[in-house]
């Protein structure tokens, strides 16, 4: 298996162009911590669309660019490293669009994909619940068929961007008999339907991109079912692969690291050792992400990528807190980055769960007793 990641000239040109666009975006719309979840700007999404950077890896048949995954990784790396506001189109581009062109009906593809590609439509993902986080199969939100509709009742939490989203991709339970994971289905839920209440959740760093969603007798057209009824668990695992194998978690703290470097005492041996470890970590993390984008390692390899990159982010935050000292409490972005670090290894799949995936599916170790 090749580990030759020599950058092609066209990739370097893309990187330079993405960096220039990101810098202009930051100058106009501000620099954002975790810009892929906090930096909402539809105007900047339209800039990305004009560049062909939304849906750039989607098949040409569905309006996408048909470009290799490594090119999207390079573009995203520059955007997030700069703190450019890409959140408005991020979930649609990364997960919802691929889910719809893979599993959706022709009508769903025709109606929904163009809005994603233009940067007009905003999406969120209704997955986690108060009693169902890492164990997706235990979720309780129900969708009961009633003629040409599903009647949805339940609650979602930790839903990024729900307050501004026009659509929510909701995982719900359509069947109670049989194995729990086989009773799950995915519905496209317009957020303006009656019976939906969205409440922003103020997190420990003072931001409110997370929301909880309450669904009370929400009537969703049955035509909004994505894929097969009862097939959501498998479909969701594919979606999580897109999330876990991305560059976002590796470089979200890059602005914080750059700031810490400006204030670091390079005469201190401990500081030099930490910098060497972090720089090595960045390079290893990038190799893991690039390897996945080039189709090496298999689908389950993304679990290891996510586990490594989030733990690396935590090391960056710890380094910055030590180097900056009291200055780390000044402003908004720096305290947010440091205080939010403990959550990195929880959201999107805990490190413990990801290690189980690697052990059981990649190393073929015995399954964890349940």
Model-identified regions with their sequence ranges:
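Glycine-rich phosphate/cofactor-binding loops in nucleotide/flavin-utilizing enzymes
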Residues: 3, 7, 15, 70, ...
């Amino acid at each position: 298996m090749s580990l030759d990641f020599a950058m092609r000239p066209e990739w370097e040109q893309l990187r330079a162009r993405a960096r220039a666009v990101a810098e202009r975006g930051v100058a106009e719309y501000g620099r954002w911590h975790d810009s892929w979840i906090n930096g909402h700007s539809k105007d900047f999404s339209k800039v990305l669309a004009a560049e062909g950077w939304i849906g750039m890896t989607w098949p040409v048949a569905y309006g996408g660019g048909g470009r290799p995954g490594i090119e999207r990784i390079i573009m995203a790396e520059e955007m997030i490293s700069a703190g450019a506001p890409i959140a408005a189109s991020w979930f649609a581009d990364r997960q919802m669009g691929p889910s719809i062109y893979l599993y959706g009906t022709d009508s769903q593809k025709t109606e929904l994909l163009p809005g994603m590609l233009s940067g007009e439509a905003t999406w969120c993902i209704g997955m986690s619940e108060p009693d169902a986080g890492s164990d997706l199969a235990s979720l309780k939100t129900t969708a009961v068929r009633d003629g040409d509709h599903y009647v949805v009742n339940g609650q979602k939490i930790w839903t990024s961007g729900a307050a501004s989203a026009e659509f929510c991709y909701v995982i719900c339970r359509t069947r109670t008999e049989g194995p729990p994971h086989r009773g799950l289905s995915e519905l496209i839920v317009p957020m303006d339907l009656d019976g939906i209440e969205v409440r922003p959740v103020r997190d420990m760093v003072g931001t409110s991109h997370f929301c909880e969603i309450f669904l009370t007798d929400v009537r969703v057209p049955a035509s909004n079912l994505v894929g097969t009824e009862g097939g959501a668990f498998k479909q969701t695992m594919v979606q999580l692969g897109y999330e876990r194998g991305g560059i976002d978690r590796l470089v979200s703290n890059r602005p914080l690291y750059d700031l810490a470097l400006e204030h670091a005492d390079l005469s201190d041996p401990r500081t030099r050792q930490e910098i060497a470890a972090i720089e090595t970590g960045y390079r290893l993390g990038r190799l893991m992400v690039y390897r996945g984008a080039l189709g090496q390692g298999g689908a389950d390899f993304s679990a290891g990528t996510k586990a490594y990159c989030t733990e690396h982010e935590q090391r960056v935050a710890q380094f910055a807190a030590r180097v900056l000292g009291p200055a780390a409490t000044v402003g908004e972005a720096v305290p947010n980055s440091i205080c939010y670090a403990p959550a990195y290894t929880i959201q999107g799949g805990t490190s413990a769960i990801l290690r189980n995936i690697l052990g059981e599916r990649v190393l073929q170790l015995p399954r964890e007793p349940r």
